[in-house]
Regions:
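Single conserved hydrophobic/aromatic residue that forms the stacking wall/gate
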Residues: 1-7, 11, 506, 511-515
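Short glycine-/polar-rich loops that comprise or flank the Walker A/P-loop
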Residues: 31-34, 67-69, 188, 313, ...
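Flexible glycine-/small-residue-rich
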Residues: 38, 51, 73-77, 166-169, ...
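GHKL/Bergerat-fold ATPase module
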Residues: 100, 114-123, 160-256, 260, ...
Length: 515
């Protein structure tokens, strides 16, 4: 038993080996001379070590009543600030607040403890109250709100680390600022190293706050070594996986509370779906929530798949500047008529991440209702089945618009890529759609605002053969009339389509067609 106890004490104290030198060398950054007086337990004599840090030192006998060591710094003229109480308190609070050794400031023979001398993340979760977690969250985040989620764990294996992370209940005002960084602090053996460790957590988790304490990194690790450290890369991967899993559990067990989180941080989380290959994409997709054309509240992709119609092969979505603009889009008419759910995306990041999702989700591709052919004819609902005649053929109420299409093409020329009969329109006379393979119109709008593209690309104009206006124009064309109103009508339809598309910032001489 004595040997086992001695071995445990040696293991515990082995972490102290080499700790002194790191801080000691830094003393010469602010001191022109350093004296160390030390007396070993059991010996009468003490020794003074003195150096100016320029490569030479002296050792001589000294007097010291008690055992131990004392270090005296003779500060440089430009380092007198380190004699100020406030400066000392700030430094200790920032870097050594949680080390096990208490740090005491003595002033006028009165002692004041400057650090907590304990680290909450080293304790068992069962020994920590929610109030204590909240207090530490407010300390580490400089906030006053309650943590929406707390995640505390210790990992042991190829490398050991502890993590205590929080998701705020309120969104920071600078969450979308270009210079915004994550707020996770890196500690090594309870000593603060940096709160600006690139790659410690991914940018799309920059709302997460807390600490990660690594046991296996050296205290004097540099910023360059941190950026290239394989251990930190592995820790980052593990931490990201853990946080996403915790969010998934929260979403499944408390969906109402998850809605609150999504409204605060959903747009940031979706950033992880765009850009470089991400091994966590599937986990992120399971966390994404959408507004829908057929339901109130938010829906997940699993909810969407469960409600797909017979014959539906794609996950349909539409992007736009705002939810109000999207809901009034004519592109939704045909889908609404068949009861097909369309996901409504209005965050600026949506156009970027969803256009890069070539692999889709659960073998279903993402398809924009503003691009290509709608393929609605392959999806049937109860109304479609009731509209079939005895031979199984659908009754046709469409008007032959081929002559009108030719007339409109002649008028619009290269202003449009093509003119087609629409199967996605039920109420509106016309709309613009992007051809398959072309850039989505809302994405083009965003890029034009940032001067990333020049003029708007020509689009496909679709006309609704069941609309009274189109029927009237078809009659005029069939009657062989050369009425100038046909040309004006074509230009008016095109302008109306551009207004509804909200992707064109100007109209060509609109005053000529204002009545």
């Amino acid at each position: 038993y004595p040997l086992r106890r001695q071995r445990q004490m040696c293991i515990r104290d082995s972490g102290l080996i080499g700790q002194f030198g790191v801080g000691f060398y830094s003393a010469f950054m602010v001191a022109e001379k350093v004296d160390v007086i030390t007396r070993k337990a059991g010996e009468k004599n003490a020794w003074r070590w003195s150096s100016d840090g320029l490569g030479e030192y002296t050792v001589e006998k000294a007097s010291k009543e008690d055992r131990g060591s004392s270090i005296t710094l003779y500060l440089k003229k430009d380092a007198k600030e380190f004699l100020e109480d406030l400066r000392l308190r700030t430094i200790v609070k920032a870097y050594s607040d949680h080390i096990s050794i208490p740090i005491v400031l003595v002033k006028d023979k009165e002692e004041e403890s400057l650090n907590e001398a304990s680290a909450i993340w080293t304790r068992q979760k069962k020994d920590i109250t929610q109030d204590q977690y909240t207090e530490f969250y407010r300390h580490v985040s400089s906030g006053y709100d309650e943590p929406w989620m707390t995640s505390h764990w210790r990992a042991e294996g190829r490398f050991d680390y502890s993590a205590l992370l929080f998701v705020p209940s309120k969104r920071p005002f600078d969450l979308f600022h270009p210079d915004r960084k994550h707020r996770v602090k890196l500690y090594v053996k309870k000593v603060f190293i940096t709160d600006d460790c690139e790659g410690l957590v991914p940018e799309y988790l920059r709302f997460v706050k807390g600490i990660i304490d690594c046991e296996d990194l050296p205290l004097n690790v540099s910023r360059e070594l941190l950026q290239k450290n394989q251990m930190l890369t592995s820790i980052s991967t593990a931490v990201t996986k853990r946080v996403l899993n915790e969010l998934k559990k929260k979403a499944e067990k408390k969906p109402e509370e998850y809605v609150e989180f999504w409204e605060n941080f959903g747009a940031v989380l979706k950033e992880g779906l765009y850009g470089i290959p991400n091994e966590h994409k599937n986990s992120l997709l399971e966390l994404v929530r959408f507004k829908s054309s057929t339901r109130d509240g938010l829906v997940s992709l699993k909810d969407y798949l469960a409600g797909m119609k017979d014959g539906q092969e794609n996950i349909y979505y539409i992007t736009g500047e705002s939810q109000e603009a999207i809901k009034n889009s004519p592109h939704l008419e045909g889908f609404a008529a068949k009861g097909i759910e369309v996901l409504l995306l209005s965050d600026p990041i949506d156009d970027f991440w969803i256009s890069s999702m070539f692999e889709g989700y659960e073998d279903k591709k993402f398809s924009s209702v503003t691009k290509g052919s709608a393929e609605l004819e392959n999806i049937e609902d109860a109304k479609d089945k009731g509209a079939k005649d005895k031979k199984g053929e659908k009754k046709s109420k469409k008007t032959d618009v081929s002559l009108l299409i030719a007339s409109i093409k002649l008028t619009l020329g290269e202003s449009v890529k093509d003119v087609k009969e629409s199967i996605r329109l039920t109420d509106s006379a016309c709309c613009l759609v992007a051809d398959e393979g072309d850039m989505d119109m809302n994405l083009e709008r965003i890029l034009r605002q940032h001067q990333q593209v020049a003029d708007a690309a020509p689009r496909v104009l679709e006309i609704n053969p069941t609309h009274p206006l189109i029927k009237g124009l078809v009659k005029k064309v069939k009657d062989g009339e050369t009425d100038p109103i046909l040309e004006d009508a074509a230009l008016l339809l095109f302008d109306q389509a551009k207004i509804m598309a909200v992707s064109y910032t100007h109209l060509t001489l609109p005053t000529k067609r204002i009545v």
